[in-house]
From Swiss-Prot:
The gene is nadD. Its EC number is 2.7.7.18. Keywords: ATP-binding, NAD, Nucleotide-binding, Nucleotidyltransferase, Pyridine nucleotide biosynthesis, Transferase. One of its GO terms (biological process) is NAD biosynthetic process. InterPro entries: Cyt_trans-like (IPR004821), NadD/NMNAT (IPR005248), Rossmann-like_a/b/a_fold (IPR014729). The lineage of its organism: Bacteria, Bacillati, Bacillota, Bacilli, Bacillales. It catalyses: nicotinate beta-D-ribonucleotide + ATP + H(+) = deamido-NAD(+) + diphosphate. Catalyzes the reversible adenylation of nicotinate mononucleotide (NaMN) to nicotinic acid adenine dinucleotide (NaAD). It is an enzyme of class 2 (transferase). This is Probable nicotinate-nucleotide adenylyltransferase. Gene3D superfamilies: HUPs (3.40.50.620). The keyword Cell wall biogenesis/degradation does not apply. It comes from Staphylococcus epidermidis (strain ATCC 35984 / DSM 28319 / BCRC 17069 / CCUG 31568 / BM 3577 / RP62A).
Length: 191
């Protein structure tokens, strides 16, 4: 039987409770053999003016994995550097996991702009997209995709960075270990 591998890509700057809720819902719905957190080097459709060095984002993901009890980190995009095109990442993983069934998690925000993704038609042949709702209660997705409804949690990495900058609490917004790491390293404060 082919392995099922779920990929959860993102900047994770920082990883937060809403990310972990998505990971948990998908993990328990799909029951993959491997669940990869896939930190991007540079997401092609996002701005990067507050990006931490990748080793710090990886460290925060490692701390979050300890809290949720599952997951591994795939550093393919970080190792490659430059824009993190999902198509190139999937081709690389197909070389390693030849017959694996690959799943890639996206939110409705990304689902609504898939037409802008690099080589999207080829990518759709290589991976099954899992669309999690972040903007709407009901979503209609293409029949070759999987839709998973998750509880709406209005937390963003931008909000967390702003709260740190304004000396506001981020308790429960991020895992405790991640909160401690952010404080110890002095991330996101005025510099």
């Amino acid at each position: 039987m082919n392995k099922k591998i779920v990929l959860f890509g993102g900047q994770f700057n920082p990883i937060h409770t809403a990310h972990l809720a998505v990971a948990s819902e998908v993990y328990h719905a799909i029951k993959p053999d491997i669940f990869f957190f896939l930190p991007s080097y540079m997401a092609p459709l996002k701005h990067h003016n507050t990006q931490l060095y990748s080793e710090h984002r990886v460290k925060m993901i490692q701390l979050a994995i300890k809290e949720i009890g599952f997951g591994e980190i795939c550093t393919t995009d970080l190792d490659r550097k430059g824009p993190s095109y999902t198509y190139e990442t999937i081709l690389h993983l197909k070389e390693i996991y030849h017959n694996a069934q690959l799943y890639f998690i996206i939110g409705t925000d990304q689902y609504n702009q898939l037409d802008k993704w690099y080589k999207i038609n080829e990518l759709k042949k290589l991976v099954t997209f899992i669309v999690v709702n972040r903007e709407t209660d009901n979503q209609n997705v293409s029949k070759e995709m999987i839709s998973i409804k998750i509880p709406r949690i209005d937390i963003s990495s931008t909000m967390i960075r702003n709260r740190v900058r304004m000396n506001q609490s981020i308790k429960v917004l991020v895992p405790k270990r991640v909160e401690n790491y952010i404080k110890e390293e002095g991330f996101y404060g005025d510099k």
